[in-house]
């Protein structure tokens, strides 16, 4: 199954971002005292008791200029829809407020587990204030202090207990799972429909792990594939259309469960900043990536247009220089046939293992071609290399001093490895370690 998702829900100014940063282990959100302040980044990976999970700060979801109670209602709705476990946060210094009760009423209706966190109880004398919060009806309240980090261990223990009971959707390892991500209206659903409309494709819908996620399984050229969360692509409704970050949240979950990510761009509108952010999620997750330019039928073009558009993509998506770029139209189905072969190639390269002796021949030839760098009179020495992981392919290069491995030389080695083995569509990782 994908990583569990934990959402932090609560009215403004109860300390959601402070707790988010404490659990995530880094200061990702902007923390201010102004109620309702919005944040740019609302998610992070975290770990507790050997569980990896995604943490969501719903306080970062801006619904716009709506009445206060409508905002927290929307916030709780999104958490209910996407989270596996909800941390309901209140301010222990304020006691139970009507706004807390409003959030609680909404959370009662969800079947998701809720853990109640009473924040801002910064010293032991204040802990007695926690008992008032039993009235909210979520069982034991956990006293915490985001400022000092007190009580977080007990809170996370309670959250992790619920991970054991989560449903698990496992597909056979031979089944390639992929998703289509992109901003609204780039044509993700239309692409799926165009793909599944081919005669060679046999389709069946599989219930996913979230309440309304549906994965679509199909056979292509006698192999099984799963398109992750086809329901998410079709999700409509006012709260979701007005909340860009809702679709980001959904895309994160789909990326996490996929082997290959197809990043869909709108050929008619061109590239915008949101496209780069969405593509960045796939790259950060270490997934294989294919870039799809949809609506190519609507673009006025000459013999240079496609090449210029691809150059523009390469300039904006330098971090995805390994990803193939495909041009197609879901409407006319032109070039749709190129998508599945590219996904298959990216998937196979993502899981590729190379022979150690051939790898080392490549590395030593590279060193002979371009000698290793020196720093303060000391030269980097490379002894040998080995592949340590797949999905994505990861390599350890054993050296005399890892500090001497400049990023530009690491990039040079990556390029030589790519020249030798291909690896189109997948990132590869290289780590320098000292030989013991």
UniProtKB/Swiss-Prot annotation:
GTP 1 binds at residues 10-17, 57-61, 119-122. Residues 352-436 form the KH-like domain. Keywords: GTP-binding, Nucleotide-binding, Repeat, Ribosome biogenesis. Signal peptide: none annotated. GO terms for biological process: ribosome biogenesis. Residues 4-167, 176-351 form the EngA-type G domain. It comes from the Bacteria. Pfam families: KH_dom-like, MMR_HSR1. InterPro entries: G_ENGA, GTP-bd, GTPase_Der, KH_dom-like, KH_dom-like_a/b, P-loop_NTPase, Small_GTP-bd. SUPFAM superfamilies: P-loop containing nucleoside triphosphate hydrolases. GO terms for molecular function: GTP binding; ribosome binding. GTP 2 binds at residues 182-189, 229-233, 294-297. GTPase that plays an essential role in the late steps of ribosome biogenesis. Associates with the 50S ribosomal subunit. Belongs to the TRAFAC class TrmE-Era-EngA-EngB-Septin-like GTPase superfamily. EngA (Der) GTPase family. This is GTPase Der. It comes from Bacillus pumilus (strain SAFR-032).
């Amino acid at each position: 199954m994908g990583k569990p998702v934990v959402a932090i829900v609560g009215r403004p100014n109860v300390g959601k971002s402070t707790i988010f940063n404490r659990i995530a282990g880094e200061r990702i959100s902007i923390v201010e005292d102004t109620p309702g302040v919005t944040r740019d980044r609302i998610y992070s990976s975290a770990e507790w008791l050997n569980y990896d999970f995604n943490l969501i700060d719903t306080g970062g979801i801006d619904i716009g200029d709506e009445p206060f109670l409508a905002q927290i209602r929307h916030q709780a709705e999104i958490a209910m829809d996407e989270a596996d476990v909800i941390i309901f946060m209140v301010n222990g210094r304020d006691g139970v407020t009507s706004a807390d009760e409003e959030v609680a009423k909404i959370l009662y209706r969800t079947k998701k587990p809720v853990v109640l966190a009473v924040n801002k109880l910064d010293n032991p004398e204040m802990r007695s204030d926690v008992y008032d919060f039993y009235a909210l009806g979520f069982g034991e309240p956990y006293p915490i202090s985001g400022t000092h980090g007190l009580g977080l261990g007990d809170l996370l223990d309670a959250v992790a207990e619920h991970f054991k009971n989560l449903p698990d959707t496992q597909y056979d390892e031979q089944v390639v799972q992929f998703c289509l991500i992109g901003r609204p209206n780039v044509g993700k659903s239309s692409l799926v429909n165009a793909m599944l409309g081919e005669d060679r494709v046999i389709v069946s819908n599989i219930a996913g792990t979230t309440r309304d996620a549906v994965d679509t399984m199909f056979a292509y050229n006698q192999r099984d594939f799963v398109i992750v969360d086809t329901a998410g692509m079709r999700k409509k409704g006012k709260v979701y259309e007005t909340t860009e970050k809702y679709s980001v949240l959904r895309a994160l979950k789909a990326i996490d469960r996929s082997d290959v990510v197809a990043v869909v761009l709108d050929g008619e509108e061109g590239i915008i900043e949101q496209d780069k952010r969405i593509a960045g999620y796939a790259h950060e997750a270490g997934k294989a990536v294919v870039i799809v330019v949809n609506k190519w039928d609507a673009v006025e073009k000459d013999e240079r247009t496609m090449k210029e558009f691809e150059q523009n993509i390469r300039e904006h998506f330098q971090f995805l220089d390994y990803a193939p770029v495909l041009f197609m139209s879901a409407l006319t189905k032109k070039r749709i046939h190129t998508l599945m072969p590219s996904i298959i190639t990216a998937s196979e390269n993502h899981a590729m293992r190379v022979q150690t002796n051939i790898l080392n021949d490549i590395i030593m030839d590279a060193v002979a071609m371009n000698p290793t760098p020196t720093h303060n009179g000391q030269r980097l020495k490379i002894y040998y290399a080995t592949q340590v992981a797949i999905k994505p392919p990861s390599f350890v290069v054993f050296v005399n001093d890892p500090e001497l491995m400049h990023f530009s030389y690491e990039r040079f080695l990556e390029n030589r490895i790519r020249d030798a083995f291909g690896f189109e569509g997948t990132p590869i990782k290289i780590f320098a370690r000292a030989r013991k």
